Amino acid sequence: MTTYREAGVDVEAGYEAVKLMKNHVKRTFRPEVMTELGGFGGLFSLDKEKYEQPILVSGTDGVGTKLKIAFLTDKHDTVGIDCVAMCVNDIICSGAEPLFFLDYIAVGKNYPEKVAAIVKGVAEGCVMSGCSLIGGETAEMPGFYPVDEYDLAGFTVGIVDKKKIINGKTIKAGDKLIGLPSSGIHSNGYSLVRKLINPTENNLKEYVEKLGCTLGEELLKPTKIYVKTIMDIIGKYEIKGISHITGGGFIENIPRMIPDGLRAQIQKGSWPVLPIFDLLRDLGNMADKDIFNTFNMGIGMIMAVDAQKADEIISYLDSKGEKAYVIGSISEGEDGVDIC
């Protein structure tokens, strides 16, 4: 008689992984969570009295080929933060507060400790975002993924009052663009990074003076989560538009928040570019157009604000220990971005 285990699926390992991750998941629970881990669906009680016209906002994303760095370094407890960050940073561009999160992990072979380490990172990202990890799926797929590899994706739902939706419609010529620093490459552009660096177990262990850490440590720095900073600032100031600088860099993402007939002018040198981007530029002999169309260049989130409020907002953020820079402005013109 042929068993499921002989086909490559270890159900007992799945049970063990759930057991190991339970405490990580529970620490993310908000009071609105109505279910324990292991049910068929996650229940979340929505307090509609807090909103005049509650609008749900959803987002989904994955970590991409940054996972290859985790495989080579055998470090798996931070990529979950990346997964959460990529989702929640998207929905806060609409002004939405993240409520809950679900993850999907597909593995070639279920190693319970490894899966628990991944979920630990997801839980950490949820705590940083103030949202609850109310469900997920770990799929063991023998013959589909190599035994030491996996994929990781997530899904989040948030909420915003209809009158407080941030959609960029009020952005006008003369408005200023405020940039919030990134922690590093974040989770986009890693196919190019890997082509330029050709990562191996050995070179990822090498200390790079200009980075101040090993190459592996730099490439695995978790994506910065901006939820608490953005939720704080939109509660005190009018933020006209927000752009999460992900795949496509400045060139693709800034126009997503700007109305037709307006153009963004980005001033080079107005913020400190992280050393990793100088390294990548040199390795690939990349022109500005290409590198700004791929990487975040040290700015992970951009806000459009009234010009008269820009300095005040930056001072407020500074008082909270958050760096921010006026990195450009809005002008009339054909849709697009100028890197000046």
From Swiss-Prot:
| Class of enzymatic activity (EC top level) | ligase
Pathway the protein takes part in: Purine metabolism; IMP biosynthesis via de novo pathway; 5-amino-1-(5-phospho-D-ribosyl)imidazole from N(2)-formyl-N(1)-(5-phospho-D-ribosyl)glycinamide: step 2/2
Similarity section:
Belongs to the AIR synthase family.
Q: State where the protein is found.
A: Cytoplasm
Q: What is its main location?
A: cytoplasm
**EC numbers, comma separated:** 6.3.3.1
Which GO terms are recorded in the biological process aspect for this UniProt protein? 'de novo' IMP biosynthetic process; adenine biosynthetic process
Q: Which UniProt keywords apply?
A: ATP-binding, Cytoplasm, Ligase, Nucleotide-binding, Purine biosynthesis
Native species = Ruminiclostridium cellulolyticum (strain ATCC 35319 / DSM 5812 / JCM 6584 / H10) (Clostridium cellulolyticum)
- Protein name according to UniProt: Phosphoribosylformylglycinamidine cyclo-ligase
